[in-house]
Swiss-Prot record:
Record-linked Pfam families: AI-2E_transport
Gene Ontology CC annotations of this record: plasma membrane
GO biological process, one term: transmembrane transport
Entry protein name: Putative transport protein YdbI
Gene name per UniProt: ydbI
Length: 350
C-alpha cells in the first residue's frame, strides 16, 4: 500500500492522473462542448484584441481595461445587428443561388472540367447521390442553427463577464494555493497555462490566416467577376479555419464555379490564385504567427485532421491541430531551435 501511495506521489504519475481526470470531466460535459469551446475562443480572442486596442489608445491618452472591453462588446453587438439586418438577406440569397448552381452541376456532370477523363480512370461517379448526401448533412446542421446561435450568445456573455472580472477571478483562484486542493490547483494551473499558450495561440493564428485568406480570395473573385461573392467568401473563411486542408478543399467548388463562369482559363486563374494565397500562408503568415513548436509536417497535419474529425466531428477539423500541439507542448516535444533558445532565455531572465 505504501508503495502504491509513493507511486502516485511521483510528479509525473500525479500529473498524468490529474490529466486523465480532467479529460474524463470534459467527456462527461460533452453535450456542452460547443458552449465551452466557444466561450474559450471568444474570451481568448477578445482578450488579445483588448490588449492591442488598449496599447494603441494608451499612446494618446490613458484608458481603463473595462472601458475598452465595454466598447469592443458594444461594437461587436452593433456589427452583429447590422450584419443580421443588412447582409444576412444578401448572403442568404447568394447561398441559395450557390446551392442551385451546385445542384445543376451535380445533375449535369458533363459541365465539370475533365469529367470524361476522371470517369475513365475511376469509373462511373454518381455525383447527384453524393450531393444529396452532402445536403442532408448540411440540413442537419442548419436544423440546429437556433441552438447554436443561442450557444454563441451565451458564450459571448460569459466571455464578457470573465474579462470584466479577470483580476477578481485570478485572486479568487489563487486562494486554492493554500487549500487542501493545492495539488490539483498546481497541476490544473500548469495545464491551463500550457493550454492558453499553445491551443489559444494556434487558434488565434488560424483565425487571422482564415480572415486574410478570405479577404484575398474575395478581391481575386471580385476582379474575375465571380457570382455569389459574399457566399463564396464565407465558405472560404470557414474552410480557412481548417489548417492546410481548408485551402485545398476550397479549390474544388471554386474550380467548378470558375469553369461554369469563364471556362478552362478561369479554372487556371483560380488555381493560380489559390496557390498564391497558399504560398502567402505558408511562407509569410505561418512563420509570423506561429512559433517553431507549432509547425507540423503536412503528413501529420492531415493525419490529425482525419482522426480528429472522426472523434470530434466538424469541431475536430478546427480544434484538432491546436489540441495536438497542446499535447506536444505538455510532452516537451519542441524543435532543436526551441531547446537551444530555452537556456539562453532563462539565463537572460535571471
Amino acid at each position: 500500500m505504501a508503495a502504491l501511495v509513493k507511486f502516485f506521489q511521483h510528479p509525473g504519475v500525479r500529473r498524468f492522473s490529474i490529466f486523465v481526470v480532467l479529460t474524463g470531466v470534459l467527456y462527461l460535459f460533452k453535450s456542452m462542448i460547443n458552449l465551452i469551446l466557444l466561450t474559450f475562443i471568444f474570451t481568448f480572442l477578445m482578450d488579445r484584441l483588448e490588449l492591442v486596442v488598449r496599447q494603441f489608445v494608451s499612446q494618446f491618452f490613458r484608458v481603463s481595461q473595462r472601458v475598452v472591453i465595454t466598447f469592443l462588446y458594444m461594437l461587436l453587438a452593433v456589427l452583429l445587428t447590422v450584419g443580421g439586418f443588412v447582409f444576412y438577406p444578401v448572403v442568404a440569397a447568394q447561398i441559395q443561388q450557390l446551392v442551385k448552381q451546385i445542384k445543376h452541376i451535380a445533375y449535369h456532370p458533363d459541365s465539370i472540367p475533365f469529367f470524361d477523363e476522371i470517369t475513365s480512370v475511376f469509373g462511373d461517379i454518381n455525383i447527384s447521390s453524393y450531393v444529396k448526401e452532402g445536403f442532408n448533412v448540411v440540413y442537419t446542421y442548419l436544423a440546429d442553427i437556433s441552438t447554436f446561435g443561442l450557444q454563441v450568445v451565451m458564450a459571448l456573455i460569459l466571455s464578457m463577464f470573465f474579462l470584466f472580472e479577470k483580476k477578481r477571478l485570478s485572486e479568487f483562484m489563487a486562494k486554492f494555493k493554500t487549500s487542501k486542493l493545492r495539488v490539483f490547483y498546481e497541476e490544473i494551473a500548469f495545464f491551463g497555462s500550457k493550454f492558453a499558450r499553445t491551443f489559444g495561440k494556434v487558434l488565434e493564428a488560424q483565425f487571422i490566416i482564415a480572415l486574410v485568406n478570405c479577404i484575398l480570395t474575395f478581391i481575386a473573385l471580385w476582379i474575375m467577376h465571380f457570382p455569389q461573392l459574399f457566399g463564396l467568401s464565407i465558405m472560404v473563411f470557414f474552410l480557412g479555419l481548417i489548417p492546410v486542408a481548408g485551402v485545398v478543399i476550397s479549390l474544388i467548388p471554386l474550380s467548378i464555379i470558375a469553369y461554369s463562369t469563364g471556362g478552362g482559363m478561369y479554372v487556371l486563374y483560380i488555381v493560380l490564385v489559390i496557390f498564391a494565397i497558399h504560398a502567402i500562408e505558408t511562407y509569410f503568415l505561418n512563420p509570423k504567427l506561429m512559433s517553431a513548436k507549432t509547425e507540423l509536417p503536412i503528413f501529420f497535419t492531415f493525419t490529425v485532421l482525419i482522426f480528429s474529425e472522426h472523434f470530434f466531428g466538424i469541431w475536430g477539423l478546427i480544434i484538432g491541430i491546436p489540441i495536438f500541439v497542446f499535447l506536444l507542448d505538455i510532452l516537451d516535444v519542441t524543435n532543436k531551435e526551441d531547446r537551444s533558445k530555452g537556456p539562453r532565455e532563462n539565463s537572460d531572465k535571471k
